[in-house]
């Protein structure tokens, strides 16, 4: 019953600090660069999209929610600096997180049956938090902060969704598109 061993103490400390988004000593710094990690989140997003796919008319949101536009002009994307890509991905991920949380609140206040839908919302929230932490370790948050004398980034393009089907489609498309493109490029360049 003495003092815990040092590795155990470090593990406990890292588990406490990880949700805060602080750098953790034990966390593999380039975990997001392992394609299997991102593919797991993409698979969860696709499952949520598929569950709600037959829902052109429902389950509806009681208000429209703003989400990031997921369209990618590949030629323009390739010409962008990694810092510009980081800004777009970081802003998009933040807006998407807000949108999913808003969807969760609207579902909780509705009379719609929510069992399976709530499960996928909870998975999406957990996945977005994990992806945010992994992007922080990769340095996306630092890259998305422009110096005071820099030209401000272009405003994030957005669109409105009115049902959970479209919300999960945007979530899935964002992960498969901009997030995957950014992490692939940042990992290839070795940016941190």
From Swiss-Prot:
The keyword Signal applies. One of its GO terms (cellular component) is extracellular space. Its main location: secreted. Disulfide bonds join 33-187. Residues 1-26 form the signal peptide. It is found in: Secreted. GO terms for biological process: erythrocyte maturation; erythropoietin-mediated signaling pathway; positive regulation of cell population proliferation; positive regulation of Ras protein signal transduction. Glycans are attached at residues 50, 64, 109. It comes from the Eukaryota. Gene3D superfamilies: 1.20.1250.10. The keyword rRNA-binding does not apply. Keywords: Disulfide bond, Erythrocyte maturation, Glycoprotein, Hormone, Secreted, Signal. GO terms for molecular function: cytokine activity; erythropoietin receptor binding; hormone activity; protein kinase activator activity. Produced by kidney or liver of adult mammals and by liver of fetal or neonatal mammals. Belongs to the EPO/TPO family. Hormone involved in the regulation of erythrocyte proliferation and differentiation and the maintenance of a physiological level of circulating erythrocyte mass. Binds to EPOR leading to EPOR dimerization and JAK2 activation thereby activating specific downstream effectors, including STAT1 and STAT3. This is Erythropoietin. It comes from Alexandromys oeconomus (Tundra vole).
């Amino acid at each position: 019953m003495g003092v815990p061993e040092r590795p155990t103490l470090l593990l406990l400390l890292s588990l406490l600090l990880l949700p805060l988004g602080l750098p953790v000593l034990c966390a593999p710094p380039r975990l997001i660069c392992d394609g299997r990690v991102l593919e797991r989140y993409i698979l969860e997003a696709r499952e949520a999209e598929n569950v709600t796919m037959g829902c052109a008319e429902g389950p509806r949101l009681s208000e429209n929610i703003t989400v990031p536009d997921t369209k990618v002009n590949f030629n323009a994307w390739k010409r962008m600096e990694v810092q510009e890509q980081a800004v777009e991905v970081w802003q998009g991920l933040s807006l998407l997180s807000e949108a999913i949380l808003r969807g969760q609140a609207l579902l909780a206040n509705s009379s719609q049956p929510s069992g399976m839908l709530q499960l996928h919302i909870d998975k999406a929230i957990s996945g977005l938090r994990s992806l945010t932490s992994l992007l922080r370790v990769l340095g996306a948050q630092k890259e998305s902060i422009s110096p005071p004398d820099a030209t401000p980034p272009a405003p994030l393009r957005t669109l409105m969704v009115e049902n959970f089907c479209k919300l999960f489609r945007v979530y899935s498309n964002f992960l498969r598109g901009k997030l995957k493109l950014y992490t692939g490029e940042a990992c290839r360049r070795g940016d941190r």
